[in-house]
Amino acid sequence: MKPENKLPVLDLISAEMKTVVNTLQPDLPPWPATGTIAEQRQYYTLERRFWNAGAPEMATRAYMVPTKYGQVETRLFCPQPDSPATLFYLHGGGFILGNLDTHDRIMRLLASYSQCTVIGIDYTLSPEARFPQAIEEIVAACCYFHQQAEDYQINMSRIGFAGDSAGAMLALASALWLRDKQIDCGKVAGVLLWYGLYGLRDSVTRRLLGGVWDGLTQQDLQMYEEAYLSNDADRESPYYCLFNNDLTREVPPCFIAGAEFDPLLDDSRLLYQTLAAHQQPCEFKLYPGTLHAFLHYSRMMKTADEALRDGAQFFTAQL
């Protein structure tokens, strides 16, 4: 699609979203568009520091978790000693960027609003790790904490998965992996999915939306996919194209959040319509005027804070 035919997104977004887009960090170097992935990761971490400031203070603990691929770092956020459940958080970043620091505020707010223990899993990024390594690391971490729940004083009788963007795909894929392979890590009470991608290769929103402002042009999406997958056949795997999985039975309750001007919005709409058509418990909420990744900006955006509260409320309602 010719770029000129796309929607004038930056003219259409909400006033608070425009404020975020126009917020400058004078001490930040330019985005290393032609740099290495390592340089882009470093920039992303630096850029997110401003947006992570002022998050709620709470007890935090770090553990290295053994997996067949090696040790994976995890971080526990404990808002209270008697947590009713444990939420595993998977960060976004196109499978190639992001870590526990870039999504620190999101995890802290989710823990605060849900009053549940939140465990961030620093899964190995691509292209160093190829599908399905990240999912297997996440599942290994769930199993580890389930086995060590008493020693670590966490409630693993009821768990959930949450994630944004690529992390949302990993969250739902991990829940389906546990179901399909009959792995017991506690009851999966809910899955919280903010503006994820779930397997569409083309859509109306992918045509109309996406640009330099969100890093989600068709070329960008192809680059993330090529970094993540091992081969072309993986595109049809039921743990990458989740619409190739069985979404008609035993899907945990899903909170599906969409951003109005996100090229991935149709992924969320299709997921919701599929689950709803088969009487699987789910809720869809569209956040008007927002861009992909708006969840990061709760320091400045009431809508981002609202989206986190909505997800937390949905999860606690399942307990």
UniProtKB/Swiss-Prot annotation:
Enzyme class: hydrolase
Keyword entries, A-Z: Cytoplasm, Hydrolase, Serine esterase
Gene Ontology molecular function, alphabetical: acetylesterase activity; hydrolase activity; protein homodimerization activity; short-chain carboxylesterase activity
Positions annotated as active site in the UniProt record: S165, D262, H292
pH dependence of activity: Optimum pH is 9.0.
Pfam families, per database record: Abhydrolase_3
Enzyme Commission identifier(s): 3.1.1.-
Function: Displays esterase activity towards short chain fatty esters (acyl chain length of up to 8 carbons). Able to hydrolyze triacetylglycerol (triacetin) and tributyrylglycerol (tributyrin), but not trioleylglycerol (triolein) or cholesterol oleate. Negatively regulates MalT activity by antagonizing maltotriose binding. Inhibits MelA galactosidase activity.
Family classification: Belongs to the 'GDXG' lipolytic enzyme family.
Name of the molecule in the record: Acetyl esterase
